[in-house]
Amino acid sequence: MANYDVLKVDGSKSGSVELSDSVFAIEPNNSVLFEAINLQRASLRQGTHAVKNRSAVRGGGRKPWRQKGTGRARQGTIRAPQWRGGGIVFGPTPRSYAYKMPKKMRRLALRSALSFKVKENNFTIVDNFGFEAPKTKEFKNVLTTLEQPKKVLVVTDSEDVNVELSARNIPGVQVSTAQGLNVLDITSADSVIITESAAKKVEEVLG
């Protein structure tokens, strides 16, 4: 267990929180992390690519010329692959690129990603944001006060509409819940801001 500073949105220290080293301070497993990122990227692919083979191309129902006597090579249809406008051979067909990964590996990847951010000092814990209404300007000021880079992942305990709407129009800022936290979002961000309650929830799930 290790103690981490908890900040207020004005940058002052609010207190500290004790979090498990098995979640936030492990030696990152790069190979598992790489596999988890590839898995997520693969599942994001649409896989709607398609071409028409010789049976799907329109036309070509009759034989273009008789079998014998013309001196030309025999042909059965003008939609054979060697013809212009003919069907495609072994072309792409619609498919899903998604594949599965064992739960233990997925959780190890998450712990590795979080530990990497902590190790690089790109991990900030705040007590809470406490927005009573969506305020983009105020949220931008919070990021400036906390000295955050352009690409930031904000993690809240549960869905916070005011935080989501405040951050929605700021380029490079993404909001997630503790339950929806994933490896691709963490590694894509330069820094992670997480509320104290969200950090506890993540520790509970991954610990």
UniProtKB/Swiss-Prot annotation:
<dbReference type="GO" id="GO:0003735">
    <property type="term" value="F:structural constituent of ribosome"/>
</dbReference>
<dbReference type="GO" id="GO:1990904">
    <property type="term" value="C:ribonucleoprotein complex"/>
</dbReference>
<protein>
    <recommendedName>
        <fullName>Large ribosomal subunit protein uL4</fullName>
    </recommendedName>
</protein>
<dbReference type="GO" id="GO:0019843">
    <property type="term" value="F:rRNA binding"/>
</dbReference>
<keyword id="KW-0689">Ribosomal protein</keyword>
<feature type="region of interest" description="Disordered">
    <location>
        <begin position="54"/>
        <end position="76"/>
    </location>
</feature>
<comment type="function">
    <text>One of the primary rRNA binding proteins, this protein initially binds near the 5'-end of the 23S rRNA. It is important during the early stages of 50S assembly. It makes multiple contacts with different domains of the 23S rRNA in the assembled 50S subunit and ribosome.</text>
</comment>
<feature type="compositionally biased region" description="Basic residues">
    <location>
        <begin position="60"/>
        <end position="71"/>
    </location>
</feature>
<keyword id="KW-0687">Ribonucleoprotein</keyword>
<dbReference type="InterPro" id="IPR002136">
    <property type="entry name" value="Ribosomal_uL4"/>
</dbReference>
<dbReference type="InterPro" id="IPR023574">
    <property type="entry name" value="Ribosomal_uL4_dom_sf"/>
</dbReference>
<dbReference type="InterPro" id="IPR013005">
    <property type="entry name" value="Ribosomal_uL4-like"/>
</dbReference>
<comment type="similarity">
    <text>Belongs to the universal ribosomal protein uL4 family.</text>
</comment>
<comment type="function">
    <text>Forms part of the polypeptide exit tunnel.</text>
</comment>
<dbReference type="GO" id="GO:0006412">
    <property type="term" value="P:translation"/>
</dbReference>
<dbReference type="GO" id="GO:0005840">
    <property type="term" value="C:ribosome"/>
</dbReference>
<dbReference type="Pfam" id="PF00573">
    <property type="entry name" value="Ribosomal_L4"/>
</dbReference>
<keyword id="KW-0699">rRNA-binding</keyword>
<keyword id="KW-0694">RNA-binding</keyword>
<comment type="subunit">
    <text>Part of the 50S ribosomal subunit.</text>
</comment>
